[in-house]
Curated annotation (Swiss-Prot):
One of its GO terms (cellular component) is host cell endoplasmic reticulum membrane. It catalyses: a 1,2-diacyl-sn-glycero-3-phosphocholine + H2O = a 1,2-diacyl-sn-glycero-3-phosphate + choline + H(+). Late-budding domains (L domains) are short sequence motifs essential for viral particle budding. They recruit proteins of the host ESCRT machinery (Endosomal Sorting Complex Required for Transport) or ESCRT-associated proteins. F13 contains one L domain: a YPPL motif, which might interact with PDCD6IP/AIP1. It comes from Variola virus (isolate Human/India/Ind3/1967). It is a lipid-anchor. Major envelope protein that plays a role in the biogenesis of the viral double membrane and in egress of virus from the host cell. Produces the wrapped form of virus that is required for cell-to-cell spread. Acts as a lipase with broad specificity including phospholipase C, phospholipase A, and triacylglycerol lipase activities. PANTHER family: GM01519P-RELATED (PTHR10185:SF17), PHOSPHOLIPASE D - RELATED (PTHR10185). Palmitoylated. Attachment of the palmitate moiety is essential for correct intracellular targeting and protein function. Transmembrane segments: none annotated. This is Envelope phospholipase OPG057. Induction: Expressed in the intermediate phase of the viral replicative cycle. Residues 307-334 form the PLD phosphodiesterase domain. One of its GO terms (molecular function) is hydrolase activity.
């Protein structure tokens, strides 16, 4: 029936947050715990989850979600959790706790062995989905600040499930033509919605390039295009901006996003606000990059702040007209090698709601000037 019905504005998407209890503000949006709980409760056929690692038992709310998944699997609901081969540290414990859940490890880059599965998303019954920066860990569900999107619009869920099928084809145990050649470029009907054909103003973007498939948009192309076309404002809330790519222990300069930010500030007078994370998961280059942006654009309208509580939110807003939510840092290694799916929207309401989140975070007591 989809071809004969118009898509609702925003494809029925709602923003989803995890806020640690020690923050000085609360969220008006669905929590990640509530989102995952709803997906499990409403599931009738299947629940598919993609995450770099799986450690839900590390917090009470994470354990509650895993127990709900266990109950669903015991009722006959098919549950598959995709993990990166290098993120399976807790796999044995989880399998013994719930043998009915199918855990599959993937290696999206057997040829060079540098790419990881970074994608953080859930799909159920081709009807509901979550995509964002909350991995399937207790921290992401309870104690680390994250941002994502939940939709119960079936066409969008179906489109995200196609990405799950792509990653699943890179099963690290089984051999297939996909993981033998590290290429999924010929996957049929790999996406229905993209930058030239959004649904309700919403579309997904993908990375890395060798996993694109037919008609998918490369995430870095869309992000850089939006940065380069910005006219008035760019707001970025990210764990890290790192203009390098690491291969075999060596670092190589990857200035694409970094230069696009500088050009927007200096050449076009765009107002830029950058809110970066500052915790132990940061790349060593992250703060140096933030400081260099601040120094290079000292005579321009570019401001940098540091968020002092664990913050894995990865958010980009351009001209108050476009929002991008992802699981990857603005990091050359992530964009060149790792596998993930990002959420994009030009829907006015979704952009406005994301902007309010950024403004709240920017003025909060947890955001400190880089110069302090």
């Amino acid at each position: 029936m989809w071809p004969f019905t118009s898509a609702p504005a925003g494809a029925k998407c709602r923003l989803v947050e995890t806020l640690p209890e020690n923050m000085d503000f609360r969220s008006d949006h669905l929590t990640t715990f509530e989102c995952f709980n709803e997906i499990i409760t409403l599931a009738k056929k299947y629940i598919y989850i993609a995450s770099f690692c799986c450690n839900p038992l590390s917090t009470t709310r994470g354990a509650l979600i895993f127990d709900k998944l266990k109950e669903a699997s015991e009722k006959g609901i098919k549950i598959i959790v995709l993990l990166d081969e290098r993120g399976k540290r807790n796999l044995g414990e989880l399998q013994s706790h719930c043998p009915d859940i199918n855990f599959i490890t993937v290696n999206i880059d057997k040829k060079n062995n540098v790419g990881l599965l970074l994608g953080c998303f859930w799909v159920s019954d081709d009807e509901r989905c979550y995509v964002g920066n909350a991995s399937f860990t207790g921290g992401s569900i309870h104690t680390i600040k994250t941002l994502g999107v939940y939709s119960d619009y079936p066409p969008l869920a179906t489109d995200l499930r196609r990405r799950f099928d792509t990653f699943k084809a890179f099963n690290s145990v089984k051999n297939s033509w996909l993981n033998l050649y590290s290429s999924a470029c010929c996957l049929p009907v790999s996406t229905a919605y993209h930058i030239k054909n959004p649904i309700g103003g919403v579309f997904f973007t993908d990375s890395p390039e060798h996993l694109l498939g037919y008609s998918r948009d490369l995430d870095t192309d869309v992000v850089i295009d939006k940065l380069r076309s910005a006219k008035t404002s760019i707001d970025i809330e990210h764990l890290a901006i790192v203009p390098t790519t690491r291969v075999d222990g060596n670092s190589y300069y990857w200035p694409d996003i970094y230069n696009s930010i500088i050009e927007a500030a200096i050449n076009r007078g765009v107002k830029i606000r950058l809110l970066v994370g500052n915790w132990d998961k940061n790349d060593v280059y992250s703060m140096a990059t933030a400081e260099s942006l601040d120094a290079l654009c000292v005579q321009n309208d570019l401001s940098v702040k540091v968020f002092t509580i664990q913050n894995n939110t990865k958010l980009l807003i351009v001209d108050d007209e476009y929002v991008h939510i992802t699981s990857a840092n603005f990091d050359g290694t992530h964009y060149q090698n790792h596998g993930f799916v990002s959420f994009n929207s030009i829907d006015k309401q979704l952009v406005s709601e994301a902007k309010k989140i950024f403004e709240r975070d920017w003025v909060s007591s947890h955001s400190k000037s880089l110069k302090i």
